[in-house]
Amino acid sequence: MKKTIISTLVIGLVSGCSNTNLLKDNLASEQSVINLSKSSNEAKSRNIEFLSGAYLSERKVPKHDIKFSGKYVEFESKSPIELIDVLDGLSKQYNIQYVFSDELEDENSEENKKSSGSSSAKKIKYSGPLAGFFDYLSSAYNMHFEFGHNNLVKAYHYKNQVFNLQQYFDDNKFSSSMQIGGTSGTSSGLKGTADTAIESNSWEKIDEFLSASLGETGKFTIFEDYSLVTVKARPDKFLLLHTFFDKLINESKMQIAVDYRVVSLSEERLNQLAAKFGIENAGKYSITSDMVDAISLSQVGGGLGASYRSASARLDAVVNELSQEVMHEGHFIGIPNRVMPLNVTTNSKYISSIETTKDTNTDEETRTVKVSDLVTGFSMMVMPKILDDGRIQISSGFSRKQLVSIGTAQGITLPTVDENESMNTVTMNPGEVRLAMLFKDNYIQNSNGVQLLGGGTENKKSARYIAVLVGASSYKTNDLASNRVNIYD
């Protein structure tokens, strides 16, 4: 056989085999190696499976393994009967084997007295497919049925299920604090203290929900490190569980882009804009969300076109028309119910006290100088939430501290600072722009002062308005792992 192959190759070369034919042979050889490698990889990958849902432990038996799936049943009881009597009838008629695989715990508990079970008698009336009859019995008796091979039906008082949330929740405990600001208050679920902070922890929410929902006999375990939740409860509890987890999963697949601008403008500018857009009460005017809407719609209509749904584009349009100075701007991207923090601060040192100590024996004086920190700048926290109707609710905290002037007295530094802090909640449609907060800023500047957030250094008292504008958009992420891949086809 070897001789034949070698001889054939020699003949091919002598007869002037072209380079093209040699190239084809090489390609065919390479393709053969590639196909062999693919087959080897597929054989090694048969233990890998991408899940289409969050539920690991619910095993579905293929239809061809349920030999009675195509049969029809009519069942009607003239008086209430227990589940065991129903299963006895099915066993005789359709040769179905059944077994009760667990027992009802604490049968005398208030929960189990109110709930159905295998010992509860019910009036039964059903006509339809035999496989669907078990769904009917599950609802009537609050039982869970699993179908095995050889026509075996297992009846459970409790259902066990593992919820896998790994692809939806990572390390999802988030906290944020404002590095500046000292006023206190509480608004919209935000916690305001001397160290203003927001914290979000989905696992705590899941724990609270399960504790309140599973009843006296329900049990659950949360494995945060593996993002798994195991639940054992009566079957009627799982509809609520599925609704709850599906909502969390759907929210975690959403991403929210939040844009913000902190702008300043004068009272004169406000009056001009009020007159331009026909807004009344210009003499005592302060900016309103109506003006923001009017500017936004006007600018969009003026040619933004495809950018209509872009919150960033609409926000820029509002800022260009409205503001005299952009103090801060930023862009957050995250998922719902997660804190998005921003701290832009400057830490300065100043002499806060001088202590003099005199030695009575030597008349020598010792001076101790104490230096303190002064943090100025800007802090912001944003926590977005997607409502059931698709709108976006943004809870935000804003804190700003600026150094107005510095004086001295007997060697001690006397800084004058201006603080503003606010917490609020705004609700908007995706792509819209809203006024998050507004405050009037009166400040005094002198030649020795230091003005941190804009402005000059003239010796006069000035007034301006500081506005925080927020825009948000939401979109659904493409999660390849959520698509089921059947590697056996």
UniProtKB/Swiss-Prot annotation:
Record GO cellular component, one term:
plasma membrane
Keywords, sorted A to Z: Cell membrane, Lipoprotein, Membrane, Palmitate, Signal, Transmembrane, Transmembrane helix
Q: Which residues form the signal peptide?
A: 1-16
Broad class of the protein's primary localization: membrane
Give the residues carrying a lipid (S-diacylglycerol cysteine).
Answer: 17
Q: Where is the lipid attached (N-palmitoyl cysteine)?
A: 17
Provide the topology term for how it sits in the membrane.
Answer: Lipid-anchor
Q: Does the keyword Transmembrane apply?
A: yes
Subcellular compartments: Cell membrane
Q: Which residues cross the membrane?
A: 174-190, 294-308, 402-417, 442-457
Task: State the protein's purpose.
Answer: Involved in TCP pilus biogenesis.
Entry protein name: Toxin coregulated pilus biosynthesis outer membrane protein C
Question: Organism source for this protein?
Answer: Vibrio cholerae serotype O1 (strain ATCC 39315 / El Tor Inaba N16961)
